[in-house]
UniProtKB/Swiss-Prot annotation:
Residues involved in Zn(2+) 2 binding: 527, 532, 545, 553
Family, similarity comment: Belongs to the RRM CPEB family.
Gene Ontology CC: one annotated term: dendrite
Protein name: Cytoplasmic polyadenylation element-binding protein 1
Phosphothreonine: residues bearing it: 172
Lineage: Eukaryota, Metazoa, Chordata, Craniata, Vertebrata
One Pfam family named in its UniProt record: CEBP1_N
Provenance organism: Homo sapiens (Human)
Post-translational modification Phosphoserine, affected residues: 43
Gene that this sequence comes from: CPEB1
């Protein structure tokens, strides 16, 4: 970001207005420089070095940083009659402390080493280029003002923890702390000749930049330099928010929580199992995403003649203190049964949930289908439902609740599949996966809803477990590519009926496929974004989605449990 001349002048003004900050100036080090020059037989040129401190009183009488010729001359260590200047405040040469003349190798190029840059350009040109472009390229050559000595600069290093920035600082401590009697004995010495006394003088120099340059945040007004750095950091974090929404996820993706993630991506290997985690999170995306379209209406009526039920039924609204023994004692009159508590994904699904947190529902699994028929005959039900779906209720008791009415939801096996056109060939490439289905939604109703929204539905199926009871997902096949892509693009659909309101999730139906990139490895990961829309192996996924515009893509994986259950 390039700053205008007015902004740069304002920045320099703010810097020099802070009298208490240790400034990079010879004004407070004039005596030291005179002694250094005397030791070096007056070989240094201090013709343009400022020696007079700038106080607030003088500065207030200097509009637009203009000084008279006499004032400028009075600030020189060795004033000359030929000296001319139009500015009272120090320029880039003044900020260099006259260290250009000391032949400090690498002073004007703190990002380089002595060995790599033997033939350097003039320090004046380098410092001027940094000051004219104070942000420059933060990833490349940092400005001179961002290279403080410890401890004043320690907080800034914490704000920029990237290794390349940390390593790019000019390490002056070996030079300033050296006490070798012969500079040639030290590999870090930047002087061609010197002594202990000269090293002591150099060590006492105040070369830390003003504090306004060190502070990147605060309650006061931000100067142009702070605004520039802040905007750069905002842009980088905005890019991170597209991948990882929270600081926790960002720290997992880029170890060390680097401000610039690209460096860590190149240096640290990506977690090989991050794709699986993202795919699992995507399966619950309907809970946190807004619906793109809504369907509302009445579900198709159901007319059953001698229906066949699944041996598994759902009990809703069970007493909070109910036990497995209480359930078995209540329902064993209809036949042998077992109890499945919520949390089927756990290691012990047949055990009640831990703690005193009631789930409110449970599954009963009978050994025989006729036991379900007997249970439904013992229930009270409402056959006058507008959609033809009878609601069954059974009264049961627990130790603390008497005559609690619980809802019994059976499943008719014929509701698992619906075919609109039996002669139509089903194309898996035009099939979508629908997740987060409501338990009262059968295949015919699902086909009707998606046909109203996108058209072209020829088949709908509800995924079931080993007991042929629905597991909350289904598949819908279209007869044309346009309807299929419309459904995939919709992603989230809200269904509103007189009985329930539910938001479902639509994804491409996944098959076993080879990687579409290398064609040699299995491709278990699918990218649903229209830019990709391909199957990937693990290596090809990382390679493809390391590009800047593709990092936000979410992977899909086929659910192994769904494959085994249906």
């Amino acid at each position: 970001m390039a700053l205008s001349l007015e902004e740069e002048a304002g920045r320099i003004k703010d810097c020099w207005d802070n009298q208490e900050a240790p400034a990079l100036s010879t004004c407070s080090n004039a005596n030291i420089f005179r002694r250094i020059n005397a030791i070096l037989d007056n070989s240094l040129d201090f013709s343009r070095v400022c020696t007079t401190p700038i106080n607030r009183g003088i500065h207030d009488h200097l509009p637009d940083f203009q000084d008279s010729e006499e004032t400028v001359t009075s600030r020189m260590l060795f004033p000359t009659s030929a000296q001319e200047s139009s500015r009272g405040l120090p320029d880039a040469n003044d900020l260099c402390l006259g260290l250009q003349s000391l032949s400090l190798t690498g002073w004007d190029r703190p990002w380089s080493t002595q060995d790599s840059d033997s033939s350097a350009q003039s320090s004046t040109h380098s410092v001027l280029s940094m000051l004219h472009n104070p942000l420059g390229n933060v990833l490349g050559k940092p400005p001179l003002s961002f290279l403080p000595l410890d401890p004043l600069g320690s907080d800034l290093v914490d704000k920029f923890p990237a290794p390349s920035v940390r390593g790019s600082r000019l390490d002056t401590r070996p030079i300033l702390d050296s006490r070798s009697s012969s500079p040639s004995d030290s590999d870090t010495s930047g002087f061609s000749s010197g002594s202990d006394h000269l090293s002591d003088l150099i060590s006492s120099l105040r070369i830390s930049p003003p504090l306004p340059f060190l502070s990147l945040s605060g309650g006061g007004p931000r100067d142009p330099l702070k605004m520039g750095v802040g905007s750069r950091m905002d842009q980088e974090q905005a890019a991170l928010a597209a991948v990882t929404p929270s600081p926790t996820s960002a720290s997992k993706r880029w170890p060390g929580a680097s401000v610039w993630p690209s460096w860590d991506l190149l240096e640290a290997p990506k977690d090989p199992f991050s794709i699986e985690r993202e795919a699992r999170l995507h399966r619950q995306a309907a809970a946190v995403n807004e619906a793109t379209c809504t369907w509302s209406g009445q579900l198709p009526p159901r007319n059953y003649k001698n229906p066949i039920y699944s041996c598994k039924v759902f009990l809703g609204g069970v007493p909070w203190d109910i036990t497995e023994a209480g359930l078995v004692n209540t329902f064993r009159v209809f036949g042998s049964l077992s109890v499945e508590w919520p949390g089927k994904d756990g290691k012990h699904p047949r055990c009640p949930p831990k703690g005193n947190m009631p789930k409110g529902y449970v599954y009963l699994v009978f050994e025989l289908e006729k036991s379900v028929r007997s249970l439904l005959q013992a229930c009270s039900h409402d056959p006058l439902s507008p959609d033809g779906l009878s609601e069954y209720y059974f009264k049961m008791s627990s130790r603390r609740m008497r005559c609690k009415e619980v809802q019994v939801i059976p499943w008719v096996l014929a509701d698992s599949n619906f075919v609109r056109s039996p002669s139509q060939r089903l194309d898996p490439s035009r099939t979508v996966f629908v997740g987060a289905l409501h338990g009262m939604l059968n295949a015919e109703a699902l086909a009707a809803i998606l046909n109203d929204l996108f058209g072209g539905v020829v088949y709908a199926g509800i995924d079931t477990d080993k007991h042929k009871y629905p597991i909350g997902s289904g598949r819908v096949t279209f007869n044309n590519q346009r309807s299929y892509l419309k459904a995939v693009s919709a992603a989230f659909v809200e269904i509103k009926t007189t009985k329930f309101t539910k938001k479902v999730q639509i994804d491409p139906y996944l098959e076993d496929s080879l990687c579409h990139i290398c064609s040699s490895q299995p491709g278990p990961f699918f990218c649903r974004d229209q830019v990709c829309f391909k199957y990937f192996c693990r290596s090809c996924w990382h390679w493809r989605h390391s590009m800047e515009g593709l990092r936000h893509h979410s992977p899909l994986m086929r659910n192994q449990k769904n494959r085994d259950s249906s």
